[in-house]
């Protein structure tokens, strides 16, 4: 049993930001930190005070996180980036909004004294003395302190205050993981109410010392427990007066939703999974209660989530095609007009969208990737609408005359015809590259629609049904927003975005089979009509070949594609492998091409190199970040593993940005999460000379000074399926609509009492709805009887001691 937390984050836009550049504008981007750990960086939106990002992320993290902060920054090419402001949401604030926090939040000024992070290890004792009780405070060590100096470290010391007396530890130079092991004693007076204050500071020779955080201990509670030892989270100084600058720094529109799930062992979900799978296997031949009932009881706002959870569950069971086939039949049974077929946001439409994103994303990248990259690289000005043509944007400098409007329109049409032709040609050649399960699903869709709407007058309807998903809900959205489909790392600029929009419109016209209705909407698209008409013929030929797959061919193709399984993650990185003593600088990194599969992390000089080295996946013990000071550069991670002889080794890898760093860390953590011997602690520094750079510990193989973060990952489109989590999410949804399910059960069983499902032998066998209600009841009891998931990082007694 495990407790899991997921944070859905959507950074929408900003408004009324202050100008940071001499041009009267800014180049804003966002950094997202969870407990002061940077995990996300948005794209930079250039030269604007009202940026739009529209970026979505989902982060899996331990349930013990405390806060998520959004920093709006101004990018500068020549100097350090400026901080515009921040929005901080505590875990409690997010959890108080069951449907998620959504809306505008004012940016506030970043106060260095509030940028507190890390924990301090204390041993606290109350023991009797000759005249009065004594309070003993042992300051042992600290970890993950905020780096306050330019070299990426701090020079921390601790100040302990009680009843007007102040004691200080020694200063540990250049460390965010200091060890003191110093003890201070104070005399306790009976009935004294004053608290013990432990403050961490960064010592500075010239300027004032920087505040690193504090812990305030309730001495009266400590008297009761007599002795306590543990890690205490450092807190900001709440006594400081806050500046009232809300609104002066602009606002940020956010959507943040927290989902906490307690996932039971697989055996608990088997009855639910078996029941749903049985319903799908029966299809329209059986009573068919559950799937239609789930659709009926699912609200519009959560339909996409429910569709995705069901789709992933059945995909893991090998029943995705059968599940979607059942939904196709249900939707066709209630559709009489061909022009409304699969155009609503039904469970069938949402499930098919999710299916294509889960099963067809690699295929999409193979078809669209080269075309999208070419559009981004060319940066051509493209416009077909005469009312929007701006000749000045395309004028030729030097001796050449500016282009006329007619020339701009003709050149734009030629460019779009070339892109559309290249896309359709790539699509026509891609039949064998399409996953077998996707082809088989489209085959079922094509057949069901043709059976429902036979006759020559409906000849195009099966083709339009396929293109309504393939073109209108998959290819066109990916063309318009390539970053959201992982085709590009950054959003398109205004010029490229317009080209992509026009190309997406052309693809939609082809997908609509060039109907008169689609042509009448925008007459200025007429120059593309010859290519569109030719594309319709190409697309129909492609679909005919796509759906021409039999069961045997499906199995053979699936087997072939599975042998060509793509890497989990690949790309160029810089590597430095430890070689004992000597300085480690960023210049010693060597660029290699890395490929992570479910078997190993391999690396070579080029992607096509025959000779490569590898780290076996089963040997990986941790994947963590490295302190910036260690190599004089940021975005460095370490892969800790054992070689074939069982000796511990470390490979240091440098990424180009914080997003790439976290993507690689996420991928490595996901594929190694079930490894035996995973580390619980590690050193975020390097062993230089005769000691670790982080904590100055001299024992190379000693216990790490920081805890590992193997559960902190980013959700990606190619994540492995988690059957237990999907089953838990479906259970949680059904539990939310249980009252509606009982109401339907009473209707079907002639007014039986809610909560009374027949169980006696000899009675009529339970129908599927009654069995579902019983399964929900059993799961509810399993949740209530099982202990809570992972223990919190701080015992309750430590939290109670802090005031």
UniProtKB/Swiss-Prot annotation:
The record marks 343 as: Arginine finger. SUPFAM superfamilies: C2 domain (Calcium/lipid-binding domain, CaLB), GTPase activation domain, GAP, PH domain-like. It is found in: Cytoplasm, Cytosol; Cell membrane. Residues 1-105, 116-232 form the C2 domain. Ca(2+) 1 binds at residues 21, 27, 74, 76. Ca(2+) 4 binds at residues 149, 155, 202, 204. SMART domains: BTK, C2, PH, RasGAP. Residues 781-803 are annotated as: Disordered. The PH domain does not bind phosphatidylinositol 4,5-bisphosphate or phosphatidylinositol 3,4,5-trisphosphate. This lack of binding activity is due to Leu-592, compared to Arg found in other family members. This is Ras GTPase-activating protein 4. It comes from Homo sapiens (Human). The gene is RASA4.
